Every structure is written in C-alpha cells, then in structure tokens.
Amino acid sequence: MNPGNFFTELKRRNVYRAAVAYGVVAWFLTQLTTQVFPFFDIPNAAIRFVVIALALGFPIAMCLAWLYEFTPEGIVRSEDLDPITARKGRRLTGRILDFIIIGVLLLVIAMLIYQRAPSRTEAGETIPQKSIAVLPFENLSSDKENTYFADGIQEEILSKLASIADLKVISRTSTAKYKSKSEDLKTVVQQLGVANVLEGSVQKAGDKVRVNVQLIDARADTHLWAKSYDRDVKDVFAVESEVAQEIADALRAKLAPNEANLLATAPTQDSEAYDLFLRGEAEQREALSSRKPEAFDRAADWYRHAIERDPNFSLAIARLADSQMSRHWWIHSLTEKELAEVKKTAEHALKLAPNLAEGHIAVGLVFYWGYRQYDEALGEFQHALELQPNDSRALIYSAAVHRRQGQWERCLSEYQRAGQLDPREAVVPASIATTYLQLRKWKEADRAARQSLTLDTREIGGMITLLNSCLNGTGDIKEARRIMSTFPTENRITSRVWGADVVDIIGQRAYLSIIERDFPTALKIWEPGANDPVAKSELGIAARPAIHVLAGDAASTQTESEQVGGVLEAALRERPNDPNILTQLSWIYLALRRNAEALSAARQATNILPIEQDAILGPGVLTNLAEIEAHAGETEQAIKILHRLLSIPAGLEVSIARLKIDPVWDPIRNDPGFQQLLAGKEHIGP
C-alpha cells in the first residue's frame, strides 16, 4: 500500500481520533486510580496493573478503530458497509469520538482547576501547593507506652522535611494539637495553611517495627501516595529518610545537594541509643509544657543515657544542651560554672556535626539566654534557618533577640513569619501581644493576646498581656477583674522570665487584689500549701513580704523576711549577676527596713540589665528601682525615672493609666512632680 494512501485511510477511518480519545481516557483513568485506590488500601501493584493494561490495550484499540465503524444500526465491520453507509458511519464515529475527547478533557480541566486553585487559610492567606503538615502518628503497638516511639518517628520525618527550602512545613507544636487521623481535613488545612497532610501509624513489637504512611491532598481529599514499611528497629532511620524523600518527590520539591544529604543522614547507628533519645524528647516536651524542674531533669537523664551508648550522637548532645538552657531560663538560673559546661556541650555537638541545625540552636540559646550576647546568638539562629528553613523555633528566638535589641518592626515581622510555620502555637501571638504592650499599642496587644488564649487557655504570656492591656491601657479595674475571672483559678500567673519589678514578684492574680486594695486576699493567694513548690521556690519566695510592704505592714513579716533574705543571699552568692534575685532582695530589704541595702540591690540589678542591653526586661528592672526609691524616700529620683520610662517603649510596667491606680506609687502620689506626670503624655510606638 502506498504510505500516503495508508495515512489517508487512517484519517478516513477515524483512527487518529480514536488514538487521541484513547490517550485522553487512559490518562484520566490513570489519574483516577492513583487517587482513589490508596483510599481503599488497594496495593500499588493494582495501579501498576491498570497502567500496563492501558498501554497494552492501545494497539488493540487502534486495530478495532480500523476494522469497525459506529452506524445507526450499531457497530459494523468497515468492509461490510456500502459506500454511503460507510460515510455516514465514519461521520457518526467521528462525532462520538469528538464527544468522548471533549467530555474527558472537560473533566481533566475541571480537576486541574480544582487542584491548582489557590486555597486560603483562616486568615485569608494563599495556601502554597508545596506545603505539608505531618499529623501525629498513631501508636498501634500493644504497649501503649510506645507512644514516645511513634511521636519520635513523626518528629524525625518532620525534621527532615523542614530542611527542604522548597517546601512549607508546619511545626510539630501546631500539628500535635490534632488527632492522628482527622475527620475534617479541610478544616485542618485551613487552620494550618497547608495543601497536604501526612498521616501515619507505628507498630513496634520487639525488634520489629511497621510504619504506615499516606500523603493526602487535603483540599481534594485524595491520596497522593501511600506505603507500608516492615523493618527491623535498627533500620528505622532508613524508613524516615525514604518517607521524607517520597514526600519531596510527590510534591515535586526541588532538593539542593545539601538537602538531599540531610535527608539521607541518620542521627545515630545505634538503635538503642536512638530509643533512649526518643524517650528524652518525650520528657522534654512534657517539661516545656508543665515547666516542672523534675521533667527537665528526666529529659536530661535520658539524653545522657543515649550519649553513653553513642558518644558521637550529636543530636542527643545538642538536645541535652537545649534542655539545660530551657531549665536555666524557665526554672532556675545556672551558675557561671554550670553555664560554661552547657556551652561546652553545645559546642561539642557542633564539632561532631557542623551542619546540625539543632546544634546551632543550642549554641544560640547559650549566647542568648546564658550570656546575652545577641549578635552571636543571631548568627547561630540564622545558620540554623539556612539548614532548616522551616524551623519556627529559630525564627521565634531570632524575633525575641531583636525585640531585646529594641528592633521592634523586625521582631514583629519574624514573629509573623514564625506564625505561618507554627499557626497553632500560642506562644507566637502571645509574644506579639507582649511586643505591642511594650509599645503601648493597647488594642493590638489585646487582640493578639486573645488570639493566643484561643489557642491555649493556659498560655501565661497571653494571660499577662490581656490583663495588662486593660490595666495599663485604660485603668479599668472592674474589666480587669472580669478578665481575670476567665483564667484558670489555680494559676497565680507568675513567670520567672517576667521577674522585673514588684508585680512580677507577687504575680498578676495577687497583684490585681492589691490594685483593689484587698491585701488580705493577696496574702491568701500566696499561703503556701502542703505541696506548693512555687511558693517555696525563688519564683514566689519574696511575694508575701512584698505584699506586706505595699500594705504598710512590714513589721508583721520580719521573721519571714529574714528567712527569705537568707535564702536569696545564698542564691546571690552562687549567681551574683542574676537580676531576678537582686530585685527580690530589694523588696526583702525594704521589709526589713534596710533601705540603703534595698536601693543598692535595685541599682545593681539595673547595672546588670540596663535598657540598652534588654529593651523588654530592662525597663522593668528600672521600674523596680523607681518603686524602691518611692518607698525609700527618694521621691525626686523615682519621678525622674518614671519620666524617662514614659518617654520610651515601657508599656509592660508603666503607663499613665497604671500610675493612677497602682498602690506601689502611693508614697509619692501627692507629690506635685508625680501629679505632673499624670497630666502629661506617654510615648506610643517604637
């Protein structure tokens, strides 16, 4: 046959149209099976069978298109038709094929438009295609105590994904608030701002482990990929790497060479050391939630056991240093010697693994929380972000450092970026609220604080800021009491990191009673119970003597004040540069009528932590000095300090509305200079 005639005949018999129709339908069926089969747990082999069958069916379909035509009477062999009927049949066949092609193409276009249409978060932000949240993995082990192991697998996969710059990966602190398998994925992705979620389960029995994972396009509620892994426990690192790589491939994320290396890197080759490490991680999460010193101690013990098994386990070494710095910041300050040891530990982790993001965070915390060397801390946090672009912790710490440097706009920008990666973490809006409060932007502070408490009703920063945006912004004591009634009743609302002036020493709950001039209730709040570690700790030890001073009843607390003074003086000998101890001692000395020593302690605290070094706590420490001066007869100096505080961002402690209602200023309230402050203006903004 002449080739030209052959191709003409192919066209005449609608074979070309049939080929196009078959290709379009085959593509649609392939997409359909890859989306639907995993939903019913149909093995991947079935999908491969469909693809192979469609490929093998193509030449058969082309032969049938050559041999047969559609006619009004049905399907008939082309050779059996007379010329007129054949022409009608070919036209009918062509129309049918056109309808098939157009119909399937419309379905394909609709599917693509739906999948690619930009979704939006609750805040109205566009959700990127390459975004994912790794939901908590379900523990299917018969031993329910193996939950720590399932959590650890999830966290390690998430950590590997966080190193991919081309992906948006939600932090674990946000995903931890959801169930392993959410019934309403569309709500989840709107709240988290992602297009995809990874669900999984872990079953551990002896030295065997089964990991089931499935990647879901949550907007369309379709499965992109699913797989089961049955491995020895010692091979679990390979599973974590494979899952992360499969997800990156499924979402078409571009990997830089260093990112590919990080995905393939195992934290240790010792499975028992890894198990001990995961137990430490579980305890560390509990410690950060409860702020109980014993939880931090248990976490450190597990990390040390892991390091004993594998002395080169850099991740465990870094996390040990991180845990110790968290304890230092939230619970009890380290001595200079202890701090030097933690610094050595963190640096050792980086020496073992220079590209370990967690190591850079640990060293950064030593510089930030330990030595207040802000530039060095920022350098470490930036390095961590380069290694793990989705690490919300590094962003949060960077924002906090910039805030202490008084770089308010940059601080807020970084907190907002952190909020995109950690949208359900209450600390982020609470920190934003605190920043606005310091800037005396009361409405913005109120709004952010309420957002924080919506996420977590027990968030200390949110409670403190919401209460003080009212008291400092409007001076409305009744509204403040109403706000207080919404807080957990057992919480005195104290925080060591806020330990700057008398309000922080006494705590927000008791201090509201003081503002109401109800001193007996304030004292009752601090009655030490049989099992009350806070009242007996450095955090609350000076509260009762300080309340007696404000009540004008210092004489009744001499014995207690002498005992507390002895404890704090011993602590100061161990940690001579701790401003928290000095501010508390200043009030104890006032209670003991040792005014000169009270002034000396308060001034020493301001020298250690001036505003120039800390734009958040510095004004609070200076406020404490003004309070001590007001009670020690140094009226002129107290007013001078207050004048300065009203002219800079210091809304956490000082505002005109607060000066009008706070009993701490009663000793100088009738002074003309103080009254002039009340009639003046206050600085608002950066």
Q: Where are the model-predicted features located?
A:
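Amphipathic alpha-helical protein-interaction segments enriched in hydrophobic
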Residues: E538-G540, D578-I588, D614-A630, A657
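Acidic, proline/glycine-rich low-complexity intrinsically disordered segments
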Residues: G4, V36, R90-H548, D553-E562, ...
